[in-house]
């Protein structure tokens, strides 16, 4: 009945609905391993790409600037995950086959916890990542436009 209602009433996952093949998302395109993490575009826009997979976020640490709009994009190849970033308004579900997208601006510096809040199996309690919010003056992308926690 739920599936019938979803199909006939055009019910979709929350957030900007963008479809992606969960079986191949890691092979090419924006969610390939070399494209994960924080990037700064030619226009100065900051985009973070993260894969939520049992039982970890990849990458485990992301660096973002304080006081600038950030676009966070999430995908998963396996099961439904949920995440939030403590002390912010970021709270979303990550559903296989869809890209979850959230826009936010981080208003304080420091390390924030990003746990999975949707039970995803036995290792669920160990599924978390760190968001490092750094002052704008310390947020320096490399020549490739990428910023990582390791650079700090």
Feature roles, as predicted:
Residues 67-69, 109-111:
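Extracellular Ig-like/FN3 beta-sandwich strand-entry sites
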Residues 46-50, 58-60, 64, 73-98, ...:
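Histidine- and aromatic-enriched segments that form or immediately flank copper-ligand environments
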Residues 85-109, 140-151:
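Extracytoplasmic beta-sandwich strand-turn segments characteristic of Greek-key/jelly-roll folds
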Residues 118-152:
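Extracytoplasmic/periplasmic C-terminal soluble domains
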Residues 1-52, 56, 141, 147-152:
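Extracytoplasmic entry segments of secretory-pathway proteins
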Residues 51-53, 65, 107, 134:
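A structural detector for beta-sheet-dominated domains
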């Amino acid at each position: 009945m739920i599936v019938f209602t979803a199909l006939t009433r055009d019910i979709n996952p929350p957030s900007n609905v963008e479809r992606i093949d969960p079986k191949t998302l890691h092979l090419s395109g924006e969610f390939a391993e070399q494209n994960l993490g924080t990037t700064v575009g030619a226009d100065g826009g900051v985009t973070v790409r993260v894969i939520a997979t049992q039982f970890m976020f990849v990458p485990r640490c992301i660096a973002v600037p304080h006081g600038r709009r950030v676009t966070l994009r999430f995908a998963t190849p396996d099961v439904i995950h949920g995440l939030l970033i403590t002390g912010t308004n970021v709270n979303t579900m990550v559903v296989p086959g869809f890209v979850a997208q959230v826009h936010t601006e981080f208003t304080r510096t420091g390390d924030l916890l990003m746990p999975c809040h949707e039970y995803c199996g036995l290792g669920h309690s160990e599924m978390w990542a760190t968001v490092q919010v750094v002052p704008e003056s310390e947020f320096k992308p490399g020549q490739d436009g990428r910023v990582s926690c390791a650079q700090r």
